[in-house]
Amino acid sequence: MIYIYFIYLKQDDPKKSTMRKLERFGIARRISPGGARDKLMLTRSADTVLSKNDRFIAERSGICVIEGSWNREDTFAGLRFPYGRRLPKLLAANPVNYGKLEKLSSIEAVAAALYIMGFQDDASAILSKYTWGQNFLQLNKNPLDEYREADPEKIPEIENAYF
């Protein structure tokens, strides 16, 4: 499995943190912001969209996500990460933001990244820790499959076709 890291901002209820749960299962590891420099960083402020071409970065250094509140999304607005990537548009399946565009939980974001880079089994495995997890893959099956096959320059066309 690809190494999964997260930066925990302590902005939400720790009992509801999807990444803290993965940490308890030994699947994810908490790091400081400085520890994310060489990682494939999932961030909405990135200019580059995640694609299958990013697989080698994830295999080499792992994937990192910021675990924080959607209500305080500007926390890292000024920071740039060398391997920062934004996810293509997807719908959330978590109970708090179900059906909302781009309001993914951290575990959904990591699972989407894994799926798009060709690690579908790993994506399914981490989502299995939540009763609603597999709903994310079902809800987004068609766009995820198209993103997985597409070259980076085609992803905006796919986003527009679905959303």
From Swiss-Prot:
Annotated keywords: Cytoplasm, Ribosome biogenesis, rRNA processing, S-adenosyl-L-methionine, Transferase
Record function comment: Aminocarboxypropyltransferase that catalyzes the aminocarboxypropyl transfer on pseudouridine corresponding to position 914 in M.jannaschii 16S rRNA. It constitutes the last step in biosynthesis of the hypermodified N1-methyl-N3-(3-amino-3-carboxypropyl) pseudouridine (m1acp3-Psi).
Family affiliation: Belongs to the TDD superfamily. TSR3 family.
Subcellular location field: Cytoplasm
Keyword Zinc-finger: no
Record GO terms (molecular function): 18S rRNA aminocarboxypropyltransferase activity; S-adenosyl-L-methionine binding
Name this protein carries in UniProt: 16S rRNA aminocarboxypropyltransferase
Taxonomic lineage: Archaea, Methanobacteriati, Thermoplasmatota, Thermoplasmata, Thermoplasmatales
UniProt catalytic activity: an N(1)-methylpseudouridine in rRNA + S-adenosyl-L-methionine = N(1)-methyl-N(3)-[(3S)-3-amino-3-carboxypropyl]pseudouridine in rRNA + S-methyl-5'-thioadenosine + H(+)
List of residues binding S-adenosyl-L-methionine: T18, I66, L87, S106
Enzyme class per UniProt: transferase
EC number: 2.5.1.157
GO biological process, any: enzyme-directed rRNA pseudouridine synthesis
Transferase in keyword set: yes
GO CC terms, sorted: cytoplasm
One Pfam family it belongs to: Ribo_biogen_C
Species in which this protein is naturally found: Thermoplasma acidophilum (strain ATCC 25905 / DSM 1728 / JCM 9062 / NBRC 15155 / AMRC-C165)
Superkingdom, natural source: Archaea
